[in-house]
Each structure stands twice: as C-alpha cells, then as structure tokens.
From Swiss-Prot:
Subcellular location: Cytoplasm
A GO BP entry: aromatic amino acid family biosynthetic process
UniProt organism field: Helicobacter pylori (strain J99 / ATCC 700824)
Gene, per the UniProt record: aroK
PANTHER family, per the entry: SHIKIMATE KINASE (PTHR21087), SHIKIMATE KINASE 1, CHLOROPLASTIC (PTHR21087:SF16)
Protein name: Shikimate kinase
One cellular component (GO) term of this entry: cytosol
Binding site for Mg(2+): S15
Record InterPro entries: P-loop_NTPase (IPR027417), Shikimate/glucono_kinase (IPR031322), Shikimate_kinase/TSH1 (IPR000623), Shikimate_kinase_CS (IPR023000)
Protein's pathway: Metabolic intermediate biosynthesis; chorismate biosynthesis; chorismate from D-erythrose 4-phosphate and phosphoenolpyruvate: step 5/7
Function: Catalyzes the specific phosphorylation of the 3-hydroxyl group of shikimic acid using ATP as a cosubstrate.
Homology family: Belongs to the shikimate kinase family.
Length: 162
C-alpha cells in the first residue's frame, strides 16, 4: 500500500477525513500544514505574513520530497495549494475532496476563515478555487464527492482502496 494523500481546497474536510482514515486503516496521519507550522514555529497565517507565500510553498515542496522517502504508508492531509507542486506526483494515491465553493465557505466559521490567509478576500478566494479545480482533478487518482459529509467521504475512500 502507498501513502493515501488527501487534496482539495481549504475547508473541504481533509484533516477530519485523514483522522478517520487513520483510525479505520490503523495508519499514522500526517498533516503537511501542521508539520510546516511546527518546524517553522509559526502558524500558516504567520508564515504567510512574516515569511511570505513563496517561502511557505518552498517548505511545502521540500516536505513532499521528504515524505516520499518514508518506508511505511501514511495518511497525508495536505494544504490546499499543494497541487501547485509538480513533485506531488508519485507521493501516493491521491483523493480529491471535491466540494463547491459556497458549501466550503458555509462550513468554515469566521474563526476558521481568519486562520486561512487566502480567505481574507472571498472574491479572490473564489478565483483561486476556480483556478485550482483543474489542478486537483489532474492530480487526483480518485475524486470524492465531499458534499455528503465525513462519513460519506470515508465510505467512498474505503470503497476505492478495497
């Protein structure tokens, strides 16, 4: 078994699904944003504000290469922009948690939105969402309809890997 990699726009449920998959499959869960935050000593928002998005993307790219060297399979929850990296290919079996923009925004309360620097301006966020959709689909081994909630997404992933 390879890594199971969850991709999708911020707020699509990647972190929650990763935890459930980890329990169901008895695999360790890794969260790329959390790993980067812990290493740098700043929140994702803090990294964007103090070091810039380019540095965050460099940390992300380097982490992908590092994760490829792991010998055992993991569940990997990724940041929404990870699909911009060519080196994502070959990391594992990717599952795109697909959801429409309006549903994503409804799922995130104000506090959650404040943690996500790219959601400061909803018009720009929607443009980013639309640009990234093609990248998510291009990088996906499987597309998960995430509108049905966590349990439904979990069932879909488990069916694909059965």
């Amino acid at each position: 078994m390879q890594h199971l990699v969850l991709i999708g726009f911020m707020g699509s449920g990647k972190s929650s699904l990763a935890q459930e998959l980890g329990l169901a499959l008895k695999l360790e869960v890794l969260d790329t944003d959390m790993i980067i935050s812990e290493r740098v000593g700043l929140s994702v928002r803090g990294i964007f504000e103090e070091l810039g998005e380019d540095n965050f993307r460099m940390f992300e790219k380097n982490l992908i290469d590092e994760l490829k060297t792991l010998k055992t399979p993991h569940i990997i929850s990724t940041g929404g922009g990870i699909v911009m990296h060519e080196n994502l290919k070959g990391l594992g079996t990717t599952f795109y948690l697909k959801m429409d923009f309006e549903t994503l925004i409804k799922r995130l309360n104000q506090k959650e939105r404040e943690k996500r620097p790219l959601l400061n301006n909803l018009t720009q966020a929607k443009e980013l969402f639309e640009k990234r959709q093609a990248l998510y689909e291009k990088n996906a081994s499987f597309i998960i309809d995430a509108r049905g909630g966590l349990n439904n997404s979990l069932k879909q992933v488990l069916q694909f890997i059965a």
